[in-house]
Amino acid sequence: MSGETPVKPVEVDNDVEALESAKELSLKIDLPACLNAGDSLSIPSNYDETINDLKQALSLLPLSRSLTNYTIYINGTNVSDSVDDLTTFSQLFELFQWDSVDLLKVTIKERAYTLAAVYEQISRFREIIGLHYVDRMAEDLGVASGVSRLNELTLNAVKERENQEEKDRNEKSEKDEKDEKSEETEESFVLNEEDIKSLKISAEDLSSTIDIDLAATAASFNNIHTKIKLPIKSLTISQWSPVPAFQKNKGDLLYLTLQTLENETFNITCHFSGFFVNRSSTVNFNPEVKVNEKGQVSKNYLLVNLVDSLSPSFSKVLEENELSLSTSSEHPETYLLPNNSFLATPWYIDTVHAKNYPDVSRSQLPLILNGVDGSDYVKDWNEDFQSVRELPNTNIQERILREKLIQKALFDFTKTATDTSVNIIKGNLTPMNPNEEEGKHIYLKNGIFYASDATSVEVFEATGAEEAARYVASKDLAGVKVLNKADVPGVNNLVTCIVDYLGKRIVCQAPVPGIFNAAAEGEEEKVVYGLSTDGSTISQDKSFEEPLKQIAEVFHLKPHTVEVSDEIKSESELLVSKDTKGIKGTDSRKYVIDLYRTTPRDIQFTEAHFDASNDTSYPHGESLLRHEAVAEWWKRKVSALFKAETEKLEKEGKMESKDGEKPQIVLPTDQVVFNPDAFSFDSESDEDREVVRNLSKFVKEKLIEEFLTEFPSQVAPFDGQQLTSILHRQGINMRYLDEQTKATYEPTLANYDALYRVTVQEMIARAAKHLLRKLSADVPVNLFASFVAHFHNCLLGAAVNAQPAVEIEELYRSFYPESAFNFTKLNSDQVIALITKEVFLRFRYALPEDWSSVLIHPIPLMREIALKFGIQWKAQKYVFTAQEFAAYKEKFATTSKQVETAKSKKKGKKIQVVTEVVSERDSIFVADDIVNFVPIVKDSSYKASLIDEIFQSARSHIASGEKDVGLSIFNELVAIQEQIYGRVNSETARFYTLLAQVYSELGYQSQAAFVSRKAIILSERTTGFDSYDTITAYLNSGFYEAANFDLINSVSLYNQAVATWTSVYGKGHPTLINTLTNIAENYSRASQNESAIKLLESALEFSKLANGEVSEITGIVTFRLANCLINTSKFDQSLELYRACEATFEKVLGPDDALTKQASKYVSSIETYVKELAQQAVASGNSKIKVKSQTETVKNGKKNGKKSAIPQPDPEIASKSIDDILQFIEGNNPKKSSKKSKKSKK
């Protein structure tokens, strides 16, 4: 991507080494008496760790986690009040001039509580008892977010195996190598009868056609949080709070009411000295200490200890919870809550997961969490973010802290902005301009500015209006994201996110400080660089030039003059686009906004497809290239310049100086730039326009062509998300989907067929998303489920009911205007026609007339639309044919409650009667099938370059032979990754995926298998249980388990991967061929040849359908099946397949290819062997009996006295490799391993 920070392995290397070599320090901690700790606590640390690290350690340790209000004394000095929490121990030693030591004495002392400290203690209490899990579920915008399925597979524990060091094989013969491998396989795959039975069942499942039951799949979701039991019934702020004036002087801070599991109610006083039970009741106020009949009082400094003393069940339930969590999964990542990322919400869910838990105190959380006066809720998000960006980053510790705080700040902003956006769209908040039309409403809430994308529609009136404004908003966010990663000093950008919910888009930004202030006297315009807000002037504040030069370098922008008209033009060259504005905030910082013009126009596409006067025009004329495309173009251009300069110096003989040093070549990178305002005005130079035109051509003529050329050797995408990710990484915009579709319409490979299928489906899904947005413009929030269900009936249910009706209560109709119900008039033909038109408008692709019946795969398409629009469907069997629907009609019947008014027998009074009405469905979907809608959020977070730098450093050490150093750096990197992103994050999932791969490459298969399980769980929870990241993680893990010689685990993981992608893609993904052949190979290694043959036959059958009978892939699968048949002595069948292979390879690869020659050799050898067996059979008169007798002879260890020219069938040959088998057929018995020889001698 453009603007990425270059890797500096040497500097990072030194930093990591410094991190590893940081002087160790042991902390001996004396805990306060309230913890009943007894002996001191020892914690390992080092001089580079901070006071905050110590506090975090104390909050995580079971012994001290309930302590929240304390003072830290080190060497008798109160450091809590004298230094901040980010101070390192080394800085403390320097500040207080202490002598360097290995053991540091730390004393923790209680503090007097304040109301803020009481709130903090209550929050920690809720966390300890598990209420934070319930809080998270209650406040989550999605249902069953973060579910996982790995634990439901009940895998065996990872086998611990020693790493196999690389051995010098040069001194050994090739035969010995094979014998060693064979011996290793025999020793490693140990299977009992139950294992073999399980493997046979798995092979049957994998080789048969898989039908996915959505309800059964959703029921397998593992949501550990639902297993948490609460150790109390409730703890709430008492009705006697706040503390009256006459009690404040006595030290009372707050009053609580506790209800225990024993159904006892206690009123608790929060005092500056701790917590105690008082004498109050629900009707009488008496905050004095309660003395029981034994003359005892219940008082404790810690709330958790007090509650424990009052409820015998409290500790017992806490212990049960801890046991439940530890036994439910060996990986804490399964149940840990993220602190700086969203969890993925499944697109279909079992309604069992849609639970609510009673908690009176939940509604009081804003009071507890937002400070004593609520001021903590109001944040200056811009100041928070900019302050963190300005933190020092001179060494690795500073960079880690800074990146961690940046990621946290970005997430907290996005979380708050998302919650508020949902409330705005639901109509719960009042806009700043209520008299304007709804699309132009703006809001300023909690330091964040909210606006619809339609607020800037006037700016793009000529180029698509609302469509252009919507597109430009996402491009602005992309520019912000690049700039966040580039981290340009001296200039600031706004923290930004976009929220799409119920067809509406809200752009959220922390505003420039002072932007809403009234203009100062003499100040006419707040924009000091770029085109003014009203478009009347172009400003060029000189103080912006230096930082903007760096921004221009990040985006490869060319300095250029701008002439909008004779009156409106720049005085000198602008460094960025005229639309990028520079503003000075009241905080004295420089800000840049409107970063959508940081890539050039896609002029070739716009000229060809946009015409505002044409009904079939592309929706807008603001099409821009992606940053990845510009970065690739720049890299190739610079590379060409470098090559040309090198060749020039070589010709001139200047490549080496007299002292042998090569000259430094300064790359003229300022030559590889483009004008971001090209094709905006008539005054631009032809040269600038030509550069932008060539850039536009570069995408279509180079990037797309290269993608299609390289695609056959790549893994075909499973779904639209993966396809989008692949194309975006290559710099290809999604508007070019038609190019892939046209190129793969008549596929020659299964991969192309899969690409065509996914591409068409993606176009339809995206068209459906846009139609849902357009058609819902007037639909009220409360009718949205009815609208979406009806749209899906029209799109997917024509075979069941082409004219579906929408049931809406008459009462609802009185609430809204008639236009709100226009969607009920839609039918299947109209929706199909609208989709066809939308696909052509957006992708310039004409769908065939029968696309709705031929190209659609209902469940995968339903999933794609759900993920794009934020729909959560109820998990049940959805059928899409009239025959299936009739069979399931009774099951689909819905029960609803109806309220009727009737006359009472007594005095004729009117009463309301509730009756249950059972009604049969006449369409596939009803509103009740939609469980929830979730917002789709695009944020400005980025991958920290520090992680990549350290990763590359570790890889380079390993590549240069310093394996131990490399692994040591990787171990440090695990901790750094978790520090920056937390243990539950999609970036952490991807990191574990890479780490598992590294371990596997180095031969650490046990570690690879273990780490890959973490990658699966985190992928499921953060990217989705059926995302391509998750599918890939399952496939990788299956491979690592096989390499670790655990076939049962491996097959379970492969089976899950196949089941998942079948629900995502449907039947017949080409990856199935490779997966089945890999599993078959493992079965064969485990001597489960019959199952291996079944799997290979299934793979071959599918390959013939997908790739054709005469294709390289079909030939290779046939070859493997032939090999496997030899293992079972089925020589005739094997020979037939080898002949087919030879013919296929000769046609596809040519007679001189290695595969063709190998197949030919096998044909010749086996023909000879089969002929000799036949001759022997004729001589004996009964081939079956003769072969059997020969086998029995070998089994009994008796050999023919004469040396026979015909090799005897060997029952042990099944365990040999194909080469050994062929050597046997050719008359050369393969040598057995030394271990086997020793065993036979015994």
UniProtKB/Swiss-Prot annotation:
GO molecular function, one term: mRNA binding
TPR repeat residues: 31-64, 109-143, 528-561, 947-980, 1073-1106, 1115-1148, 1150-1179
Keyword Transport set for record: no
Highest taxon of the lineage: Eukaryota
Annotated SUPFAM superfamilies: Hypothetical protein c14orf129, hspc210 (SSF103107), TPR-like (SSF48452)
Family membership: Belongs to the CLU family.
Subunit structure: May associate with the eukaryotic translation initiation factor 3 (eIF-3) complex.
Protein's name in the database: Clustered mitochondria protein homolog
Protein's organism: Scheffersomyces stipitis (strain ATCC 58785 / CBS 6054 / NBRC 10063 / NRRL Y-11545) (Yeast)
